[in-house]
C-alpha cells in the first residue's frame, strides 16, 4: 500500500479563496472590512517570517492588516496598554499576539487581556472553556486546520477512533475537543503514556503533535489510517542548510497509512488560512451578522 498525500498547500489555497469570496460579500452587502492586528514583540527571525506571511495573506484576502512591532524589552504595562487600545478599536476584529513572548512578559496575563470576541488565536480562557463545553467558540488555528485536513479525506468523523499525541494547550487539548465535537472517539496520549505504539495501532486517525522528530514509526500505524503530522523539527542537512522534519517517519508511514500530511506542505499551510477564517468569523459576530460560509 502507498498512502495518498494530503496536500495542505492546495487545501489552504482553496480555503483562502473561499475566505476572500466571503470578505468581498460582507464588504459589498454590509460595508464591513474585517481587520486583523498582529503584535510582534522582539525580533525573532522565525516570528518575523510568520508575521510577514500573515500580513501578506490577510491583505490578499481583502482584509485590513495592522502590524505592531515592539522592542523585546517592552514593559508589560505598555504591551497591555496596546492590547487595550486594540480591544477598543472598531476597525480591529481580530487580535493576535505572536508567541512565544520574550522573558519577563507573562503570556497568560497578555492572552487574558485580549477581548475574547477578538481572540482569533482561540487561547483566551473564555474561548478555551466554551470549546471544552462543546459550545461555539473561536478555536486555535492549528487544531482547526487539522480537522479541515482530515475532512478532506473523510466527510464524516463520526464513530472513528482517533489518537492525539501531545497535550499542549495550543494543539493537543483543543484538538481533542474539536474531534469530540465531530463525534469521534478520542484517546489523548503524551510523553508518559504506556504502550503508545499499541494505542496508535487501534486508531483510524493519528495526530502527532509532540515536536519529536520521526517519533511515530510506520509499524505504529493501523493499515489505511489517516495521519496528520503537526510536528516541526529543524535538522541540519548535508548542504549546510536545515530541513524540516515532522513527528512521523514519513517514508515508513507512506507504506502503511491511507493518507498522510507531509512536512512541510501539510498542517503549517493551514494555520494562517484558519487565522483568516477566525478573523472573518469574529468580524461577523461582532457586527451581529450571520456566520460566514467558511
From Swiss-Prot:
UniProt-listed GO biological process terms: L-histidine biosynthetic process; methionine biosynthetic process; purine nucleotide biosynthetic process; tetrahydrofolate interconversion
Pathway where it operates: One-carbon metabolism; tetrahydrofolate interconversion
Gene3D superfamilies to which the protein is assigned, alphabetical: Leucine Dehydrogenase, chain A, domain 1, NAD(P)-binding Rossmann-like Domain
An annotated Gene Ontology molecular function: methylenetetrahydrofolate dehydrogenase (NADP+) activity
InterPro entries, per the entry: Aminoacid_DH-like_N_sf, NAD(P)-bd_dom_sf, THF_DH/CycHdrlase, THF_DH/CycHdrlase_cat_dom, THF_DH/CycHdrlase_CS, THF_DH/CycHdrlase_NAD-bd_dom
One matching Pfam family: THF_DHG_CYH
A GO CC term attached to the entry: cytosol
Catalytic activity: (6R)-5,10-methylene-5,6,7,8-tetrahydrofolate + NADP(+) = (6R)-5,10-methenyltetrahydrofolate + NADPH; (6R)-5,10-methenyltetrahydrofolate + H2O = (6R)-10-formyltetrahydrofolate + H(+)
Keyword Cytoplasm applies: no
Enzyme nomenclature, EC number: 1.5.1.5, 3.5.4.9
SUPFAM superfamilies (alphabetical): Aminoacid dehydrogenase-like, N-terminal domain, NAD(P)-binding Rossmann-fold domains
UniProt binding sites for NADP(+): 166-168, 191, 232
Key words, A-Z: Amino-acid biosynthesis, Histidine biosynthesis, Hydrolase, Methionine biosynthesis, Multifunctional enzyme, NADP, One-carbon metabolism, Oxidoreductase, Purine biosynthesis
UniProt key word Cell membrane: no
Record function comment: Catalyzes the oxidation of 5,10-methylenetetrahydrofolate to 5,10-methenyltetrahydrofolate and then the hydrolysis of 5,10-methenyltetrahydrofolate to 10-formyltetrahydrofolate.
Subunit and partners: Homodimer.
Family statement: Belongs to the tetrahydrofolate dehydrogenase/cyclohydrolase family.
HAMAP family tied to this protein: THF_DHG_CYH
PANTHER family per the UniProt record, alphabetical: C-1-TETRAHYDROFOLATE SYNTHASE, CYTOPLASMIC, C-1-TETRAHYDROFOLATE SYNTHASE, CYTOPLASMIC-RELATED
Protein name: Bifunctional protein FolD
Biological source species: Nitrobacter hamburgensis (strain DSM 10229 / NCIMB 13809 / X14)
Amino acid at each position: 500500500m502507498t498512502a495518498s498525500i494530503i496536500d495542505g498547500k492546495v487545501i489552504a489555497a482553496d480555503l483562502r479563496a473561499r475566505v476572500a469570496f466571503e470578505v468581498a460579500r460582507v464588504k459589498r452587502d454590509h460595508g464591513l472590512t474585517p481587520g486583523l492586528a498582529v503584535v510582534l514583540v522582539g525580533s525573532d527571525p522565525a516570528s518575523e517570517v510568520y508575521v510577514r506571511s500573515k500580513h501578506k495573506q490577510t491583505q490578499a484576502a481583502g482584509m485590513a492588516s495592522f502590524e505592531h512591532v515592539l522592542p523585546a524589552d517592552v514593559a508589560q504595562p505598555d504591551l497591555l496598554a496596546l492590547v487595550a487600545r486594540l480591544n477598543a478599536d472598531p476597525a480591529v476584529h481580530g487580535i493576535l499576539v505572536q508567541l512565544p513572548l520574550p522573558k519577563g512578559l507573562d503570556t497568560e496575563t497578555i492572552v487574558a487581556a485580549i477581548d475574547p470576541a477578538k481572540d482569533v488565536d482561540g487561547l483566551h480562557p473564555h474561548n478555551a472553556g466554551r470549546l471544552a463545553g462543546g459550545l461555539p467558540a473561536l478555536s486555535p488555528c492549528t487544531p482547526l486546520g487539522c480537522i479541515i485536513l482530515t475532512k478532506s479525506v473523510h466527510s464524516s468523523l463520526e464513530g472513528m477512533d482517533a489518537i492525539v499525541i501531545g497535550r499542549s494547550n495550543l494543539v493537543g487539548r483543543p484538538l481533542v475537543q474539536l474531534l469530540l465535537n465531530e463525534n469521534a472517539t478520542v484517546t489523548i496520549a503524551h510523553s508518559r503514556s504506556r504502550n503508545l505504539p499499541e494505542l496508535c495501532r487501534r486508531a483510524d486517525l493519528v495526530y502527532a503533535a509532540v515536536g519529536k522528530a520521526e517519533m511515530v514509526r510506520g509499524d505504529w500505524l493501523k493499515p489505511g489510517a489517516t495521519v496528520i503530522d503537526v510536528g516541526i523539527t529543524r535538522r541540519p542537512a548535508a548542504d549546510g542548510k536545515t530541513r524540516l522534519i515532522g513527528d512521523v517517519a514519513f517514508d515508513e508511514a507512506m507504506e502503511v497509512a491511507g493518507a498522510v500530511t507531509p512536512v512541510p506542505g501539510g498542517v503549517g499551510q493551514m494555520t494562517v488560512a484558519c487565522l483568516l477564517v477566525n478573523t472573518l468569523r469574529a468580524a461577523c459576530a461582532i457586527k451581529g451578522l450571520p456566520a460566514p460560509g467558511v
